[in-house]
From Swiss-Prot:
Chlorophyll a binds at M603, Y611. GO terms for biological process: photosynthesis. The gene is psaA. It is a multi-pass membrane protein. It comes from Amphidinium operculatum. The chain crosses the membrane at residues 68-91, 145-168, 185-209, 259-277, 295-318, 334-360, 377-399, 451-469, 509-530, 584-606, 644-664. It catalyses: reduced [plastocyanin] + hnu + oxidized [2Fe-2S]-[ferredoxin] = oxidized [plastocyanin] + reduced [2Fe-2S]-[ferredoxin]. Belongs to the PsaA/PsaB family. Keywords: 4Fe-4S, Chlorophyll, Chloroplast, Chromophore, Electron transport, Iron, Iron-sulfur, Magnesium, Membrane, Metal-binding, Oxidoreductase, Photosynthesis, Photosystem I, Plastid, Thylakoid, Transmembrane, Transmembrane helix, Transport. InterPro entries: PSI_PsaA/B, PSI_PsaA/B_CS, PSI_PsaA/B_sf. [4Fe-4S] cluster binds at C493, C502. Chlorophyll a' binds at H595. This is Photosystem I P700 chlorophyll a apoprotein A1.
Length: 671
C-alpha cells in the first residue's frame, strides 16, 4: 500500500506534465518522522522532546498497548478515588446539612476550625452542583456520604487488583479481550450503560423521589432501606400527593420524575438494541468490518457520542434542570453550562483526531472509497457555507457599527428599529419565579441580539467542522502526498523545498481545529453568560420581580461590536479586577495567573524554531568559552512540539481566565 515515490499532479495540467519526486522515506521510523534524527537524539534533548511526543503513540500490535488497554480498570479505580474524596470532603468539611435546612445559603467547602479565635476563614464557594446532585440522589445525612466514601475506596482497590490481574496474570483473557473490540463495545453498552441506567432508574424511583417528596412536605425521612419496596413508595405518593414534585418554585422539580422514566427507557434501548437491534455489530457491517478492527475508530465514535451528550446536557442544565434548587443557585448554573460546553468541545475535536489516526494506520483507502471520492464536493460545499455565514453574520455587526457611528439608531438591527426576531422565537417562553430573595429563570426570550449572535455561532462551528473534516478526509492521502501511511498522524513542516508539507498532516488540522473550537465555545459561553446575568439584573430591577419589564443589557448592547467590548468585557470584568482583599480574591489571582499562562503561549506560537536554536547556540558558545560543556546537547523544540506547547498554554490560560471572570461576576451580582 505504500510507494517509494510521490506523484504530485498539478490539477490543471495534462498527464504529460506530471511532476514526480523520488523521495525515500525508508529510514523513517513508523509513527513519527522525527525518527530521521534518531541517531543524534540519544545525545541531545531531542530524545526528551520525542519522549513526550510519543508517550501515547503505540500501535495495536504492541504488547505495551495490550497492557494499557487491559489496565482500563485502573482508570476506573482513579475515578472511584475521586468520587470517594468528593463525598469524604462533603461529609467532613462542607455545609451540606445547613444547606439542606436552608437552600438559599451558598454551598461551601473546606470549612476549617476556628484559628486564633477567628471564624471560618473564607470557605470555598461550591459551584459544581454536588449539593444539588446529592439531594437528587436522596442523601440526607453526612453518614450516608461517609458510607459512599468508604465504598469508593473499596471499589477502587478492587479495580486496581483487577487491573493488575489483567496486566500480569491473565494473558490469555487479555488477548481475547483486546482482539474482539466488537464484543467489548457490546459489553460496554449492555453492562455499563444499559444496566447502569436501569439501576439508576430504580434508585430514583425507590429512593430519590420518595425522599424529595417527604422533604418537600416537611416529614421526617425514614431509612432508605424501608423505601425499597413498591408498597412503601406507593404509600408515600398516595398520602403526600405526587403533585409535590410538580411545583415550579425552584426547589423540587418534576423533571426528576422524567429523569427516572428517561433512564428506564434508555436501559431498554441499550440492552435490547445492543444484542438484537441496530446497535449490534452483527447487523452493522461498518462496525464489524472497519470500526470494530481499529481502536482509534472505536474511540472516535465514542468521543463523538460523549461530546454530543455533554453539549446537550449543557443546554439542558438551564433550559430544563433536573436537580432540586438548581435554578436559584446561579453560579452553579453558569459553571455547569460552561464546564460541559468545554468538555463537549474537546471530546468532539478528539473524535476527529482519533478518526484520522485510525484512517491512517488501521484502514485501507478502499474501505472509505465512497466517502473519499466525494471529499472535494463535501469540502467545497462546506467552504461555501463558511464564506456565506462569515460575510453575512459579521455584516450584521458591521452595519450596526456603521449606523451607530453615523448617529442613525433607527436604521440599526434591533428590537426597537429593524427587528430580526428568530422564526420560532414565540415558541421559547420565559418563566420567572421569585423564591424568597432568589429569582429563578427558566428559558430565555429570544431577541434580535440572539438572532445576530446565533449566526456567529453557526459561522464558528462550521469553520471548526471544515478544518477537522478536511484533516480527516485527507489524513491518508491527498493530491500533494498520495500516501501518508509512513508519514503517519504527525510529521514536521519541511517547507517549500519538499513540495510544501506545512500544515497538511492530520495533527496540524487538529492543532488549528482546537483554536477554532476555542473560538466557537467562547462565543457560546459569552452569549449564555451575558444574557443570563443581564436577565437576572433586569428582573431585579422590575417591579415585584415577577414580570420582566425592562430590556436587558444584553438585548440593548450586544447588537454592535462596541457593546461586547465595553458592556460585557470591560464592565463585566470589574468584579474580578477589583477582587483583591475581598472574599473574591482567589478569582482575581486566578485571573492574573491564567492571563500569564495564556500570554506565555504566544511566545511559542509567534516565534519560529530557528530563533530558539540560534539562541541556544549562542548560550552554548558562552559555555564552551568557560569550558562548561553539557554532556547532552540542548536542541530547540521541533515545530510540532513547539505548537503543542503553545496550544496547551493557550487553551488552559484562556479557560482559566474565562472561568475566574465568570464566577467573580456572577457570585458578586447574583450569588
Amino acid at each position: 500500500v505504500y510507494q517509494e515515490r510521490f506523484d504530485i499532479v498539478q490539477p490543471h495540467c495534462s498527464s504529460e506534465h506530471t511532476i514526480s519526486l523520488n523521495t525515500d522515506f525508508s529510514k523513517a521510523a513508523f509513527g513519527s518522522a522525527t525518527g530521521l534524527v534518531a541517531k543524534a537524539a540519544s545525545q541531545t534533548t531531542t530524545a526528551i522532546w520525542n519522549l513526550h511526543a510519543d508517550a501515547h503513540d503505540f500501535s495495536n500490535s504492541s504488547y505495551l498497548s495490550k497492557q494499557v488497554f487491559a489496565a482500563n480498570l485502573a482508570h476506573i479505580g482513579v475515578v472511584f478515588i475521586w468520587l470517594s474524596g468528593m463525598h469524604f470532603h462533603g461529609a467532613y468539611f462542607s455545609n451540606y446539612l445547613d444547606w439542606l435546612q436552608d437552600p438559599s445559603i451558598a454551598p461551601t467547602a473546606q470549612q476549617v476550625s476556628n484559628i486564633a479565635n477567628q471564624s471560618v476563614l473564607n470557605p470555598i464557594r461550591v459551584t459544581s452542583g454536588f449539593f444539588n446532585l446529592w439531594l437528587a440522589e436522596g442523601i440526607t445525612s453526612t453518614y450516608q456520604l461517609k458510607v459512599i466514601a468508604a465504598f469508593g475506596l473499596i471499589a477502587s482497590a478492587l479495580c486496581f487488583l483487577g487491573s493488575y490481574f489483567h496486566m500480569h496474570s491473565s494473558t490469555s483473557f487479555t488477548r481475547v479481550l483486546n482482539t474482539k473490540l466488537t464484543s467489548l463495545s457490546t459489553h460496554h453498552l449492555v453492562g455499563l450503560l444499559g444496566l447502569g441506567s436501569l439501576a439508576w432508574a430504580g434508585h430514583l424511583i425507590h429512593i430519590s423521589l420518595p425522599v424529595n417528596i417527604l422533604l418537600n412536605a416537611g416529614v421526617a425521612v425514614p431509612s432508605p432501606h424501608s423505601l425499597l419496596s413498591s408498597k412503601a413508595v406507593a404509600t408515600i405518593v398516595e398520602q403526600l400527593s405526587f403533585s409535590a414534585l410538580t411545583s415550579s418554585d425552584g426547589y423540587v422539580w418534576q423533571p426528576l420524575v422524567y429523569s427516572a422514566m428517561h433512564h428506564f427507557a434508555l436501559a431498554l434501548v441499550l440492552i435490547v438494541g445492543s444484542v438484537l437491534g441496530p446497535l449490534s455489530t452483527a447487523s452493522n457491517p461498518l462496525m464489524s468490518f472497519t470500526v470494530g478492527s481499529s481502536w482509534h475508530l472505536v474511540l472516535g465514535v465514542q468521543l463523538f457520542v460523549t461530546g454530543t451528550a455533554s453539549v446537550l446536557y449543557a443546554q439542558m442544565s438551564n433550559a430544563y434542570p433536573v436537580y432540586p434548587y438548581l435554578l436559584t443557585d446561579h453560579p452553579t448554573v453558569v459553571s455547569l453550562f460552561v464546564h460541559h460546553m468545554w468538555i463537549g468541545g474537546f471530546f468532539l475535536v478528539g473524535a476527529f483526531a482519533h478518526l484520522s489516526i485510525g484512517l491512517v494506520r488501521d484502514t485501507l483507502p478502499q474501505s472509505f472509497s465512497v466517502v473519499l471520492t466525494q471529499r472535494d464536493i463535501i469540502l467545497g460545499h462546506l467552504t461555501w457555507v463558511v464564506a456565506f455565514l462569515g460575510v453575512h453574520s459579521f455584516g450584521l455587526y458591521v452595519h450596526n457599527d456603521t449606523m451607530q457611528a453615523l448617529g442613525r439608531p433607527d436604521d440599526m438591527f434591533s428590537d426597537n428599529a429593524i427587528s430580526l426576531l428568530p422564526v420560532f422565537a414565540r415558541w421559547s417562553t420565559l418563566t420567572l419565579n421569585s423564591t424568597g430573595s432568589a429569582v429563578s429563570v427558566l428559558g430565555v426570550e429570544l431577541s434580535t441580539a440572539d438572532f445576530m449572535v446565533t449566526h456567529i455561532h453557526a459561522f464558528t462551528i462550521h469553520t471548526t467542522v471544515l478544518i477537522l473534516v478536511k484533516g480527516f478526509l485527507y489524513a491518508r492521502s491527498s493530491r500533494l502526498v498520495n500516501d501518508k501511511y509512513k508519514l503517519d498522524f504527525r510529521y514536521p513542516c519541511d517547507g517549500p523545498g519538499r513540495g510544501g508539507t506545512c500544515q497538511i498532516s492530520p495533527w496540524d488540522h487538529v492543532f488549528l481545529g482546537l483554536f477554532w473550537m476555542y473560538n466557537s465555545i467562547s462565543v457560546v459561553i459569552f452569549h449564555f453568560f451575558w444574557e443570563y446575568q443581564s436577565n437576572l439584573a433586569s428582573i431585579k430591577a422590575s417591579a415585584g420581580g415577577s414580570i420582566r419589564a425592562l430590556a436587558s443589557d444584553f438585548e440593548l448592547n450586544s447588537i454592535n461590536t462596541n457593546g461586547w467590548l465595553r458592556n460585557f468585557l470591560w464592565s463585566g470584568a470589574a468584579q474580578v479586577i477589583q477582587s483583591y482583599g475581598s472574599p473574591l480574591a482567589a478569582y482575581g489571582l486566578t485571573f492574573l495567573a491564567s492571563h500569564f499562562v495564556w500570554a506565555l503561549s504566544l511566545m511559542f506560537l509567534f516565534s519560529g524554531r530557528g530563533y530558539w536554536q540560534e539562541l541556544i547556540e549562542s548560550v552554548l558558545w558562552a559555555h564552551h568559552k568557560l569550558y562548561v560543556v553539557p554532556h547532552i546537547q540542548p536542541r530547540a523544540l521541533s515545530i510540532t512540539s513547539g505548537r503543542a506547547v503553545g496550544l496547551t498554554h493557550y487553551l488552559l490560560g484562556g479557560i482559566g481566565t474565562t472561568w475566574s471572570f465568570f464566577l467573580a461576576r456572577i457570585v458578586a451580582t447574583a450569588g
